[in-house]
Structure formats: C-alpha cells, structure tokens
Curated annotation (Swiss-Prot):
Belongs to the aconitase/IPM isomerase family. It catalyses: citrate = D-threo-isocitrate; (2S,3R)-3-hydroxybutane-1,2,3-tricarboxylate = 2-methyl-cis-aconitate + H2O. Pfam families: Aconitase, Aconitase_C. [4Fe-4S] cluster binds at residues 439, 505, 508. It comes from the Bacteria. The keyword Heme does not apply. The gene is acn. The keyword Translocase does not apply. One of its GO terms (molecular function) is RNA binding. This is Aconitate hydratase A. Residues 898-921 are annotated as: Disordered.
C-alpha cells in the first residue's frame, strides 16, 4: 500500500460494524491542499483515485492530477477512473454478452479457462428496451404486450438468462420489472458501497458507467455515473480503467422556488434550453445554491436524467440530507448513518447552501421564473412555453424545412382527412400519440399523481379523449402502479384510455407500436404533420413513430391534457378543452391540479413498504420469464442459422498489424448536416422491408411480421451493418431532396442504399469518410452507431463538433474522428462530397494533433488542403486507434501481446456457428484462440 493511502486510512463504526475508508479530509490536512475548493463531483473522482492507488492501473501521480484540478485550465490531464458498477439495458447489453460469450469460446478452444472472461466489477442488466405498444386502451393490453414481447424476443432473452447463471457478479432484472434508470434509482443504487478488501470492509461513494446515455439519472442521488458505449462498458467489466480527461465543471446556481403548478419537467426543459445555448458538451455540470433546498430527490433525478439532452457528461447533485432521506424512504436505510459519516469525512456532504466551490463557469437559473413548458417539434432543447404552443406550432408548419420547421405551402396548410370508422377528421397538429412514458418522468411521483388528478377532474366533467389518439401508460417501476392504485387514480387514467401497457421504455425509445391503420391512411392521404406528446426525453424526427413528424416532450400532466384536446393547435388559456354534461365549455384551468393538491395526496400514498414489495422478487421475473428455457454451462453455443445472435466479426484480422494508418483516396459515403443523431446513424425502431436489413431477414426466411426492431437484433452484426445510416428520415446531402438511407455511389453516379454502396467500395479496396456538421452523434449512447460505421469501411469522420459518447465510441472502434478548425466546415471549404480524401502522417499521431487533409476533385484534380483536429483526446485513444479498438486493446493486454498493432477494418461477415475453429477462417475468434494457445502453454 502506498504511503499516502496508509496516511489517509481510518475507520468508522456504525451499529457495531467497522468500515475503513481513505479520507479526503486527512489528505487535505497532510498535503496542505484545500480539497473544499474542488467541485463535489471532482472530489468523488479524487476519492476514487486515492482508494484505487495500486502503482499499476492507478498511480499516486494520477491522484495528484485530480487534487490539482484547476477551474480555468486550458488543457487537462488524463486519469484512469475505476467505476464500481456497470449497468446495462438489453439493446446494448445483448451485443456485450455476445462479445463476452465469443471471447469465452475462444479461450476454451485454446485449452484455457473460460472463466478468464468474467465481470470483475458488479454488473446489472435491466431488460426494458424490447416491449412495444402493440395493444393499448384496454385492461388486457399489458398481458397482450408481454406475450408479444416474449414471442419476439425469446431467443435474446434465453441468451440473457444463460448469462445470468454463467457469469459471476452479473445480475439480470427480467423484462416487465421496470426501466433501467428507475430501477437503478429505486433499487440498485446504494447510499454507499461496501467491499471486503483483504479482510476489511471498505466504504466508499457509488460510481458507475452505464450502456445508456441516461445513466446520468443517478447523479440525482450524488452518484457519479454516465453513459458509455457497450464496448467501453465491456472493458470496464473486465477490470480495465475508464480513461478520461479531467473535465471543466460548470456550476449551475439555482435560486428561488418553483411557482405552484410548475413541475420538474418544466424546469428540466428550461435547463436543457439554457445549457445547450451555454455549451456544456464534454463537461461536468454541478448544481448548487439555495434553490436546491426546495427540490425533492425525484425532481433532482428528473433534471439529472436529461443531462445528455443538454450535452453534459454528468448533471450532479451533491449528497445531502434530502439524499439520505430518499434512501430511508425507499427501503434502503441499513447504511444511511455510516454513509453520512463517510460523506462528511470525505468532504462530500452538502451542508451549507451558500458554499460555492470553484467552477469553470457559472450559470444562474431563477426557479421562480420557470413557466409551464414543452419542447419540440424536433429537438429536446427547443423549448416552447405552454401558453405559446398554438402560435409556435403554426410557425413551425411554415418555417423552412429543417430542424425547426416543415416548410408547408398555403395550399398544404388547408389539408385534412377523414379517419374511416371514427367520424372524425384530422389535420395538421392532430395528436396521434399521447404517451405517459420514460423514467425521466415516471420516477417522479408528483408528476404521475398530477396526471391522475387531471384525469380525475376531466372524468368528473365528462370529458373524453379523441378516438384517434393512441394513449398509453408505461411506468418505470411497479411502485408507480402501487401508489396510483392506493390513491384511486389508476382507474381515472384508465377511463381516459391510459391503461397500463408495460413496464419498460416503450414510446420514449420509439417502441410506440403501430398506429391504427385508418389513422395511418388519413395521415398519408393528406400528407399531414400530426403530433405526438410524450413524457419522454427525446423527440428527434422519426424516433417516436415513422408517421409522426411533430413530436413534443412534456410532463405527464400535459400528456393527458393534449390527449383531451386532440391537437397541439390549441391555446391552453383561450380555447376550451371540451364540454361538460350540461354543454358548458371546460377550460384547462378548471381541471388543472395545484401543487398543493398533488403534495397532499403524495404524503399519504407513498411509503417504503411499496419499494420493499416491488423489489422483493425483482430478479425472479414474470411467469413468462420463469418458464423460459435457457442453455446451461459456461459456454454459449452459437447457432449459425440464427437471425438474432451471431458470433461478431469485429476481430477479423485482429492478429495482423496494420503498419500504415494513413488514409488514401477515400470517398465520401455520406455528407450530413447538423445535429445528426445516433438514431439517424443506427435506428432502433422498425425495419423497413425494402431496406437491406429487411431484405437480409427475408432471405433468411423471416416474415415481415417477425422482423421485430433494429434494437432487438443488435446481437447480429449482419442486420446491424445493413441498418447503419438506414433511418428513413436521414438526409444525405450528396443527394438532392432525398430522405432515407441512400447515397450516391461516386464511381457511376447512381443512387444506392448506403450499405450496398459501402460494400462495393469495400470490394474495390476504397476507404470511406463521412462529412458532417455540428453535434454529430448527439442522442443515445448507441455503440452500434460506431460499430456499424466501422463495418461499412469508414476510416474517418470529419465534423464540426461531436457529442461526447459518440466521439468516444468511434475511437473505441478504431475510427478516426476529425474536427474542422478555425470556424471552417464543408461549405466554407467548398467541399461537395465528390472529392477523394488523403489524410497522411497518422502513424505517429498524438492526442489532439492537427492533421492535414487533402481533398482532391476527381475531374479537375483541384486540391483543397485544410487542417483538422484529431479528436483523440487522450493517450489511450491513440492506443485504441492503433490496435483497432478498445476490445482489441483489452485482449492484447490479457494475452500479454505488447507489440503495437495497427487498425485493420474488415466487413467480411462470417459467423462462428458450430464451425470447426481449428481453421482461422472459420471463426473470427480463431485468431485470438491462437494467441491464447501461446499464453496457456
């Protein structure tokens, strides 16, 4: 043990138990450095470095880098962060389990111990991303959707049930139990973690990474955690540090108090707007100020949940008494007293509201000025005041086509269509989906109870939801339905069609299910811009439903209100929402619940026993899960005929070095604009029959009704590489006025599917690049957006800016992210995407190095030369690029192969199946197996 660890070590005692810790208070005293000047979130990183010093992965110098954090530094060092936990959801978790299973097979084939591949940190997977809203509006909807879910996903779930038994320190929360971040908040997270190390119980703060961008929700309880790609999570699971550059920390000072009727949803949409404008991408955000005193823990969690939408790495609330009360009230009181003492000894307990650590920048938000809000129609940061919605939607209809509008003509504005069988006409703005969904809001009891109260008052007035609105209630945990039932508000919601459809992500991630066919026909007949209103966290175009172009985020209370109105072309102050039994106009003000009404109900319907009951059997799962058959043993047998799960091919040519990283004669696969999301790059929703992924499934005997979604097939790289850049709403600027997954094949000028063109380039040995604008890769922490890019043969992306997780994922797959400098972009440089690109001198590249890019016009030979910043932000990023990715680097470490090998991309697709792995060509992992044979000799 290092001297500094010995010096700072002390013990605390609680309820007769002794706990060791490494004290930041003692560290501060011994070194004469003021730890309290550091933001709380940086202090958590400091404790992590101090506790994990081993002279190998974490060195004392790494701890000093954090201790010396400077709020105004122009450059920052890299540290090896050691998260205590990993959380995963099934869309990102299935491919991770497939990777681990394939690695085990490789070791076994080499005569080694398959247990060498096993999680070394606690890992939990919550299955929540697969349930779809096929059935709604009835008491049987839940059972029908669950049955359909298991019918579609039996093979995937069997794999995960196998993993539940096959891996140590790996738990699976079965489907139907809740949403990952709400389950994490209510059950998995602890007020403090305890681990027995060399016979001593060491107590320390919770830290984690998760394979979902909204992992940040846990920042609401003072846990430092954020979303990463699946490949990064796998590395952490296998005991690797998470290498990160110390961030700037933006302090957000809350003052005042929310007005009555204004909710946490209204606040977080305001915060998202403000921080997007301020610019916090890649930075920590930390909340402080006297305004925190009035925010409940669920309010804080709602704000932390949407951290990816405002672009930060974390949105952190320090631990205080509100935090510990939450753990007490949710059946996790065992360690509360010990945790309090630990946090105080670590200088991590917020006691003085006036305390103001040093921040890189400060943003002030007066809570009393926040008003009722929505966000849309296409981005979470585009806030619209509730009272301005009618005007804002009208403006969006005629605003030029793009991020803010739909570009309708006067003639198009007049269109409407009849919905057959309903005696109703719909027009622009008609609400086709109203969904109470997402952990963002369903984790907050005040919002759900508010929606129930609005429903109750609407029922008392005799109001009805418009029949063309698809309504749904999908809570993030079973606690929600317990307290709604206890408050007698669940029947009120059901009476308006908000029946329980599932405990999962559903509409929020695009699993809204099909609209009724007569509604679809009416939309298509008049080419209508219809709307969705959901309590989710993302509203990117094409995400919620392919037939809905205007998507608004709102509180559950607003969701019920717009379901009643039937349109977003509605003034909530001036327009009546309906008529009562006597024919009198009813206005929203007549039925809107007050903050006081909600609080009065909340105080007597929620208790810790609800959480105890909901989570007592959470790992047992539903009857369907218990009946599900799963393989036994340490090894998973891949089935070469499966269209869901295949042995991944990321390690083909793994053992071969690539001595030349330079990119020569690359062509542009896509030329994209601003705010291209990971949904655009790798959609999670429906698979169109005519697209390459649909054709692949048909060729393997899968009927259209059984296609399921892209997200559910992430265990099969053949489907996913065909689904890359296959979003039906993506716009490739290489083509004029074309929407969807198409590109121009430069060698003959033809329009082709992106996948088909990429494979032709691959056959000819032509490397590829992508040109993009600002905020490239915004949205979900979808590692398949990078994996698919890699498999298509893309060597580099050149963009104006990147979202944090996607940049990291690209590097993790051996794809070079480059950034324009000096305010340049494709337009200012005169690039049209037809050029051939040369990017040289990459073999000795350094972090954040300026590289020279040559763009040669193929007809005139005119060359445009410009500089670009290599977004390899740390030394380890360079290693990943040279080795071809994170997992390749990890495997080289495991196998003791110290020589540098260069990235080699391949799109040759061979599954392991049951083929003879004695032949290196029969399985991509056979090459790895040969390394293991040397290792285990």
């Amino acid at each position: 043990m290092s001297d500094i660890k010995n010096i700072t070590k002390l013990q605390i005692e609680d309820k007769g138990k002794k706990y060791s810790l490494y004290s930041l208070k003692k560290l501060s005293q011994e070194l004469g450095k003021d730890v309290t000047r550091l933001p709380y979130s940086i202090r958590v990183l400091l404790e992590n470095q101090l506790r994990n010093i081993d002279g190998y992965k974490v060195k004392e110098d790494d701890m000093h880098k954090v201790l010396d954090w400077d709020a105004k530094a122009s450059s920052r060092p890299e540290i090896p962060h050691m998260p205590a936990r990993v959380v995963m959801q099934d869309f990102t978790g299935v491919p991770a389990v497939v990777d681990l299973a394939a690695m085990r097979k490789a070791i076994k084939d080499a005569g080694g111990d398959a247990d060498k591949i096993n999680p070394l940190v606690d890992t939990a997977m919550v299955i929540d991303h697969s349930v779809q809203v096929d059935f709604y509006g009835t008491k049987t909807a839940l059972a029908q959707n669950v049955a359909k879910e298991f019918e579609r996903n039996g093979e995937r779930y069997s794999l995960l049930k196998w993993a539940q038994k096959a891996f140590d320190d790996f738990i699976v929360v079965p489907p139907g139990m809740g949403i990952i971040h709400q389950v994490n908040l209510e059950y998995l997270a602890k007020d403090a973690l305890v681990k027995n190390i060399n016979g001593e119980d060491v107590i320390y703060p919770d830290t984690l990474v998760g394979t979902d961008s909204h992992t940040t929700m846990i920042n609401g309880v003072g846990a430092v955690g954020w979303g990463v790609g699946g490949i990064e999570a796998e590395a952490v699971m296998l005991g690797q540090p998470y290498y990160m550059v110390l961030p700037d920390v933006v302090g957000v000072k809350f003052t005042g108090k929310l007005k009555t009727g204004v909710t946490a949803t209204d606040l977080v949409l305001k915060v998202t707007e403000v921080l997007r404008k301020h610019g916090v991408v890649g930075k920590f955000v930390e909340y402080y100020g006297e305004g925190l005193e009035s925010l409940s823990l669920p309010d804080r969690a709602t704000i932390a949940n949407m951290t990816p939408e405002y672009g930060a790495t974390i949105g952190f609330f320090p631990v205080d008494e509100v935090t510990l009360d939450f753990f007490n009230n949710t059946n996790r009181s065992e360690l509360v007293d010990a945790a309090r003492e630990m946090y105080k000894e670590q200088l991590l307990f917020r006691e003085n509201p006036a305390e103001e650590p040093e921040y890189s920048n400060i943003v002030e938000i007066d809570l009393s000025e926040v008003e009722s809000n929505l966000a849309g129609p296409k981005r979470p940061q585009d806030r619209v005041a509730f009272h301005d919605m009618k005007k804002a939607f009208a403006e969006a209809l005629v605003h030029e086509q793009g991020l803010h509008g739909f570009g309708l003509t006067d003639e198009q504005l007049q269109k409407s269509a009849e919905v057959k069988g309903l005696n109703e006409r719909i027009t622009h703005g008609s609400v086709a989906i109203a969904a109470i969904t997402s952990c963002t809001n369903t984790s907050n009891p005040s919002l759900l109870l508010g929606a129930g109260l609005l429903a109750k008052k609407a029922n008392e007035k005799g109001l009805k939801v418009k029949p063309f609105v698809k309504t749904s209630l999908a809570p993030g945990s079973q606690v929600v339905t317990q307290y709604l039932e206890k408050a007698n508000l669940l029947p009120e919601l059901e009476n308006l069609g908000f029946n329980l459809v599932g405990y999962g992500c559903t509409t929020c991630i695009g699993n809204s299910g099909p609209l009724d066919e007569p509604v679809v026909e009416a939309i298509n007949e008049a080419d209508l811009i219809v709307a969705s209103v959901s309590s989710g966290n993302r509203n990117f175009e094409g995400r919620i439903n392919p037939h809905i172009k205007a998507n608004y985020l709102a509180s559950p209370i607003h969701v019920v209100a717009y379901a009643l109105a039937g349109t977003v072309d509605f003034d909530p102050v001036e327009d009546a929402i309906g008529k009562d039994a006597e024919g009198n106009d009813v206005y929203l003000a007549d039925i809107w619940p007050t903050t006081e009404e909600i609080a009065a109900i909340q105080s007597h319907v929620i208790n810790s026993d609800m959480f105890k009951k909901a989570y007592a059997t959470v790992l047992d799962g539903t009857e369907e899960w218990q009946k599900l058959k799963a393989p036994e043993g340490k090894l998973y047998e891949f089935d070469s005929s499966s269209t869901y799960i295949q042995c991944p091919n990321f390690f083909e040519k793994f053992a071969e070095g690539n001595d030349d990283l330079d990119i020569k004669g690359a062509r542009t696969l896509l030329m994209l604009g601003d705010s291209v999301t990971t949904d655009h790059i790798s959609p999670a929703g429906a698979i169109p029959e005519e697209y390459p992924a649909g054709q692949y499934l048909k060729s393997h005997g899968v009927e259209k009704k059984d296609f399921n979604s892209y997200g559910s097939r992430r265990g099969n790289h053949e489907v996913m590489m065909r689904g890359t850049f296959a979003n039906i709403r993506i716009r490739n600027l290489l083509l004029d006025n074309v929407e969807g997954g198409f590109t121009k094949y430069h060698l003959d000028g033809s329009q082709q599917y992106v996948f088909d063109a990429a494979m032709k380039y691959k056959e000819k040995g032509i490397p590829l690049v992508i040109l993009a604008g600002k905020e490239y890769g915004t949205g979900s922490s979808r590692d398949w957006a990078a994996k698919g890019t890699f498999l298509l043969g893309v060597k580099a992306v050149i963009a104006e800016s990147y979202e944090r997780i996607h940049r990291s994922n690209l590097v993790g797959m051996g794809v070079l992210p480059l950034e324009y400098v000096n305010g340049q972009n494709a337009k200012t440089l005169g690039l049209d995407g037809t050029e051939m690109f040369n990017i040289k001198n990459l073999n000795n590249i350094k972090p954040r190095q300026i590289v020279i890019v040559e763009a040669v016009h193929p007809k005139t030979a005119h060359t445009t030369t410009f500089e670009a910043l290599a977004r390899l932000d740390a030394d380890v990023d360079v290693d990943y690029l040279k080795n071809g990715g994170i997992l390749q680097t990890v495997l080289k470490d495991i196998m003791g192969d110290k020589k540098e090998s260069k990235s080699t991309q391949s799109t040759t697709s061979k599954g392991c199946g049951s083929a003879d792995t004695s032949s290196e060509t029969s399985c991509p992992f056979a090459k790895i197996a040969n390394f293991f044979k040397k290792l285990f000799k």
